[in-house]
UniProtKB/Swiss-Prot annotation:
Pfam families noted in UniProt: Ribosomal_L30
Quaternary assembly: Part of the 50S ribosomal subunit.
Family: Belongs to the universal ribosomal protein uL30 family.
Name of the protein in its database record: Large ribosomal subunit protein uL30
Membrane-crossing residue ranges in chain numbering: none
Stretch forming the signal peptide: none
Gene3D superfamilies per the UniProt record, alphabetical: Ribosomal protein L30, ferredoxin-like fold domain
InterPro entries: Ribo_uL30_ferredoxin-like_sf (IPR036919), Ribosomal_uL30_bac-type (IPR005996), Ribosomal_uL30_ferredoxin-like (IPR016082)
GO BP annotations listed: translation
Domain of life: Bacteria
Protein's gene: rpmD
Length: 57
C-alpha cells in the first residue's frame, strides 16, 4: 500500500479537543513535524477531519 506524508502546518492552540486528539493520534506534536502513514481509509478519515491544520503529500 502507498505511503502518505503528513505535516502539521498550524498550531493546535484553541482547537477543539477532538481535533487535538486526532492530530496527536496521527503522531504529530509540533508544527513542522512530518510523519508517514499507510494510505488507509482510517488515516484518510483522520486527515479529512483536521485537513485545515495539515499538509498532505
Amino acid at each position: 500500500m502507498a505511503k502518505i506524508s503528513i505535516t502539521l502546518k498550524k498550531s493546535l492552540i484553541g482547537r477543539k479537543k477532538d481535533h487535538i486528539a486526532t492530530v496527536n493520534a496521527l503522531g504529530l506534536k509540533k508544527i513542522g513535524r512530518t510523519v508517514e502513514h499507510e494510505d488507509t481509509p482510517q488515516i484518510r478519515g483522520m486527515i479529512k477531519k483536521v485537513d485545515y491544520l495539515l499538509e498532505v503529500k
